[in-house]
Structures are given as structure tokens and as C-alpha cells.
């Protein structure tokens, strides 16, 4: 039986091979820490599963109500009342389950912060540390967002003839989602309370607004696509699970890379020089 030979690299790894920009760092992390990102995705799936199941059963009920309406078992008034009640109760349940989803997001935030900062990671220890540090802020941000999303749905459903839901959703996409994403990362990096994080996120959003807006539009595009598939609840649930495991960690990592670039430019260089360029290779003459 032949002995397996260990393959060695043709040359030693040099510090100069480390990424020098946040863009390079993103692909460096994806290539070398994919297993960590995958494990993060599995935790996100586990804690987001109640939300996924809520959407699944909502879609099932919507299909059932529509079939009764088409068959004549339910008149238009009862159909609209049932759909509105389903929307209200579904939104309330989603708000409640954000407390579960916050557990994974808080822990994963710590993991991603460490990856981008170039810090060593012990996954479970860092995950627990992230939950301890970030859970309250993550809960509050998701709670506020869920309330605002529920209000948008309410306005869209009850004032549909005035098209008031459209400006509400536009405001959510243009301002609320980008600011809340930035606030989540700001609170994780600088370990401040959520209100301080939101205040600073509002100030920092506009210099880099187009990048965060693109990230927000990405979320909006996914939700819009899933909305058009709501007549296929099982397919929607499977897609959501795949998104949680494979896409969401990559998305959040990209968000961290963009945010660290912003922090380096507008905060770290002057106020937190010890954080400036963390995780990147910098020649000695630049460090001095």
C-alpha cells in the first residue's frame, strides 16, 4: 500500500501576500475561511427557521383563502378581511421570532468582525462572545425594522387605493435598511448602544450612500422575487434556506468589508488609529 505524501507549498507564505485592500480581503476570506462562513450560515438557518416557517404557512393560508374566494365559498369582503387579518397576525409572529434570529446574527457579527479585523477565531467561543456583546442591539434593530415593515404592510393593505404603500416601501429601501445595516455593524465594532449606533450610522450613511443603497436594493430584489413565488410555498422555503446558508454569510461579509473601508476613512485614522487598516497588510513605512 502506497503511503500518502503530504503536499507542501512551493514557497513560504509571506506577509506581502496578505490582502492590501478590503476588496482583496473579501475574496481572501471567502477562499481561506469558507468553512467558517458555511458554519455561520448553518447557524443563521437554524435561528431563522421559525421566520421561514412563518412565511411558509402564511403563503399556504393565502392560497387557501384565494381558492375559497375563486370557488365562491368566500365573498370579496370576507376574503379581504381574512387576508388583512393574516397579514396582521403574521407580522406580529414575525416580530416575535426576530428575537430568535437575533441570536445567530449577533454571534455571526462577532465572527465576521474578527475575520475582517484579522483576529484569530475560535468559532464557538467567538460566537458566544458575540451573542453576549451584540444580542440586545441586534434585537432592538430587528425589532424596530420588523415594526416598520409591518407598518408598511398595514398602510399598503388598508390604503391601497391611495398607493400610500409605495412611498413607505421606498423610504424603507432608501433610508431605513441601509442605516440599520450600518448601525448593526457600527455597534458590533465599537461596542456602543443601539441609539448611538443609529445616530452615527445616519451621519456616515451619506458619504457612502450608493454602496449601501445597492446592498439594500439587493435585499429588496430578493424579497420581490420571493413574493412572486408565493404561490409555491415549498419552493420559497427551500430558496430561503439556501440563501441563509450560502448567500447571507457572503452578503454580510461584503457589508463588513464596505463598512470597515468607511470606518477607516472617516473614523479610525483620526479617532481609533489602532483599528485603522486592521486585517490588511501595511508596509512598515505606512504604519509609522
State each model region's role:
Residues 155-168, 232-239:
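Membrane-interfacial helix-loop-helix connectors in multipass membrane proteins
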Residues 1-153, 181, 186-227, 236-239, ...:
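Helix-coil boundary and N-terminal low-complexity module in membrane systems
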Residues 87-94, 162-173:
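Loop-to-helix entry region at the N-terminal start of transmembrane alpha-helices
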Amino acid at each position: 500500500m502506497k503511503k500518502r505524501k503530504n503536499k507542501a507549498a512551493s514557497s513560504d507564505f509571506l506577509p506581502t501576500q496578505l490582502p492590501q485592500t478590503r476588496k482583496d480581503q473579501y475574496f481572501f476570506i471567502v477562499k481561506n475561511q469558507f468553512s467558517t462562513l458555511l458554519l455561520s450560515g448553518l447557524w443563521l438557518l437554524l435561528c431563522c427557521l421559525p421566520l421561514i416557517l412563518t412565511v411558509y404557512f402564511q403563503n399556504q393560508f393565502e392560497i387557501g383563502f384565494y381558492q375559497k374566494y375563486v370557488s365562491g365559498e368566500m365573498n370579496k369582503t370576507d376574503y379581504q378581511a381574512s387576508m388583512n387579518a393574516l397579514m396582521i397576525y403574521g407580522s406580529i409572529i414575525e416580530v416575535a421570532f426576530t428575537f430568535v434570529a437575533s441570536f445567530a446574527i449577533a454571534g455571526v457579527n462577532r465572527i465576521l468582525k474578527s475575520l475582517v479585523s484579522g483576529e484569530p477565531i475560535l468559532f464557538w467561543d467567538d460566537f458566544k462572545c458575540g451573542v453576549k456583546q451584540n444580542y440586545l442591539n441586534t434585537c432592538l434593530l430587528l425589532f424596530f425594522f420588523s415594526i416598520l415593515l409591518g407598518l408598511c404592510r398595514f398602510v399598503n393593505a388598508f390604503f391601497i387605493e391611495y398607493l400610500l404603500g409605495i412611498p413607505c416601501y421606498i423610504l424603507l429601501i432608501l433610508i431605513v435598511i441601509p442605516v440599520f445595516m450600518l448601525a448593526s455593524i457600527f455597534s458590533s465594532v465599537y461596542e456602543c448602544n443601539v441609539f448611538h449606533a443609529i445616530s452615527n450610522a445616519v451621519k456616515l450613511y451619506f458619504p457612502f450612500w450608493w454602496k449601501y443603497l445597492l446592498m439594500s436594493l439587493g435585499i429588496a430584489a430578493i424579497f420581490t422575487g420571493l413574493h412572486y413565488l408565493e404561490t409555491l410555498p415549498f419552493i420559497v422555503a427551500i430558496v430561503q434556506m439556501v440563501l441563509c446558508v450560502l448567500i447571507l454569510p457572503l452578503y454580510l461579509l461584503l457589508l463588513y468589508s464596505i463598512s470597515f473601508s468607511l470606518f477607516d476613512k472617516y473614523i479610525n485614522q483620526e479617532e481609533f488609529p489602532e483599528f485603522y487598516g486592521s486585517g490588511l497588510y501595511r508596509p512598515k513605512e505606512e504604519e509609522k
